[in-house]
Every structure is written in structure tokens, then in C-alpha cells.
């Protein structure tokens, strides 16, 4: 049973690791696409700002600031490409394969069947290897306590019309003769009652210890499940707010660019609007990954679920 629990724990950890790497790739892919799109936008902005400078509507400082931001975005693109390569190598290691490019989906298109409005029954924690192990320890301690209690009494049964029977269930024809010949073995557990009581107390203490350990294991497991559920719920709440933030910032970025072209705003406002939009889009993508990651953590916290 312990080896089965170990295999289940390793299997769950491996599946969670593979899933985490896969969805990390999807997150990085989307962040890379956003950064490349932003890179192209900044390239056009640098060109238009330079044209404004040549027309006397912008200064060299504005062009330099725009170029610096453009180069910064290019650097971010290279960093993301490197991260993608590293995660692909990690995924190949988990799959025991030669590192390669993995065909994959798109983060925005990922759908998960979720419905935790009524919570998760605590019985589902029984799939966890550590909970199963603690449960078996408690069962063994419970049976040990009952065995110690049964030693209080001789192995003779009074069965009414069936008369006297021994531990094998055979009828004792002459109880008097049986008691006379077996008085030594019969009285031994009675006179050794103090020792039996001590054994019972030890077994009882072991049962209480196992019970406390089982309760603590359940509490720890439940805490992990609650943490995963809380993270999932938080990500869902943040998702709606981030969507609204990105939509507002997209409008602001377009407006400031148009205003600058007509000389009604400064390049600093354009820089701020564009940079804030990029950060919000990257955060939006990271939050979507956090939502998925919380479900992966929930899978782990539940011990991998049912086979």
C-alpha cells in the first residue's frame, strides 16, 4: 500500500509539473505576441515622432525617449524568447525527450470545466497518499486497542443453552474438569490484569496519537485545497477588472497618440500611456495563467483525484 501511495504521489507530481510547464509556455507565447505587437507600434511611433521633429513639432529629446523605449521592448522580446526556450527544455526533461519546440494551443482559448460554488467534499481528500497513510495508521492503532481490551477476559464463552464453549467454538462436555485442568491458564490473564491494562493504555495512547496525526493531516490537506480555491477565486475576480483596465488603457493610448500628432499633448503622456498599457496586458496574461495554475495546484492538493 505504501508503494502504491508513493507511485500515486510521484504520478500526481509529474502530471502537475507537465501541466504547469505547458501552460507557462502558453502564457509566455501570449506575452511574446503582445510584446512583438508593442515593438511594432513603437517602431512606428519612433518614425512618426522623428517626422514631427523634422517638421518642427517635436524635439530631439522626444525622439530619443521614444527610441529608448523601443529598444527596451526589443530587449523584453529577447528575454521572453529565452524563457520560452528554457521552459521547453524543462518540459522535455519531464517527458524524458530530447529538447524541441512543442506545438501548443493559445492561452486565451483554454477552457476548464469548473464549478466550485458549493465547495469540495472533505471525502475527496482521501485520494491523497498522505491522508491514506495516516488513515491506515489510525486503523491499525484502533485494532491494536481492541486487541488489548479483549485480552482482559479468558477465551471461554457462556452460551446459554449451548453451554460452555472454548475459543475454537467447541462445546466443553465437563466444565468442572476443564476448569480444574485449565485453572493455571485461566487465571493467568486475570492475575496479569495489571500488565494487560498497561498494554491497553499504551495501545490507547497510540490510537490517540494516530487520531491526532490523522486530524492534522486532514487539516493540512484542507488548507492546501482552500489555498488553491482562494487563488482561483481571486484570479477570476481580478480577470474582470484587468479586462476593463486594458480596454480603458487602449483607448487612452490611441487618444494620446492622436493628440501628439496634432501637437496637443507631450511625448511623455504617450510614453506613459503606452507603457501602462503594455504592463496591464502582461498582467492580464499572467493572471490568466495564475487562474489555470490554481487549478493545477488544486489537482495536486486533492492527490490527483480518482483513477
Question: Language-model segments: which ranges?
Answer:
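Alpha-helical heptad-repeat coiled-coil segments that mediate oligomerization/polymerization in large
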Residues: 56-59, 221, 228, 263-267
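Transmembrane beta-strands of outer-membrane beta-barrel pores
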Residues: 162-166, 190
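Periplasmic alpha-helical coiled-coil/stalk elements that build and connect Gram-negative outer-membrane
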Residues: 5-120, 231, 235, 255-258, ...
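Acidic, low-complexity, intrinsically disordered peripheral segments
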Residues: 99, 112, 283-307
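C-terminal structured "cap/appendage" subdomains that terminate the fold
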Residues: 252-287
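A short glycine-centered flexible hinge/capping loop motif at secondary-structure junctions
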Residues: 53-57, 260-264, 301-305
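Sec/SRP-type N-terminal targeting helices
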Residues: 1-11, 61-65, 127, 132-136, ...
